[in-house]
């Protein structure tokens, strides 16, 4: 079956497509893709993974056409980011 594995850091993004056996798991696909060697900062024991934006466990089965995503840790408080965006939008309205 054909699946993809994707990851993005602050500077680059990578989406790898590959053929996997039908009974493969998310973790097997990630390891097989070689993405862990290209991004050594990825720590699967800490970082969350998903399929098409939905969180899944590493032992979740993959299906034909799945896009497996490795998520980076949040580095900013989402509430703070939202407040800054709202404040910025309000400033733009004054023009």
Swiss-Prot record:
Q: What is the protein's name according to its record? A: Protein RnfH
Q: Name one Pfam family in it.
A: Ub-RnfH
Kindly list the organism's lineage: Bacteria, Pseudomonadati, Pseudomonadota, Gammaproteobacteria, Methylococcales
The record, for InterPro entries, names: Mopterin_synth/thiamin_S_b, RnfH, RnfH_sf
Q: Which SUPFAM superfamilies match?
A: MoaD/ThiS
This protein's species is Methylococcus capsulatus (strain ATCC 33009 / NCIMB 11132 / Bath)
Q: Which family does it belong to?
A: Belongs to the UPF0125 (RnfH) family.
């Amino acid at each position: 079956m054909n699946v993809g594995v994707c990851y993005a850091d602050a500077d680059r993004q990578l989406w790898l497509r590959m053929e996997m056996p039908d009974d493969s798991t998310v973790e097997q696909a990630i390891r097989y893709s070689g993405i862990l060697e290209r991004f050594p900062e990825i720590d699967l024991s800490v970082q969350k993974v998903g399929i098409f934006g939905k969180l899944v466990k590493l032992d979740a089965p993959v299906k034909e056409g799945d896009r497996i995503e490795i998520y980076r840790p949040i580095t900013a408080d989402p509430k703070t980011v939202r407040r800054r965006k709202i404040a910025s939008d309000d400033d733009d309205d004054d023009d």
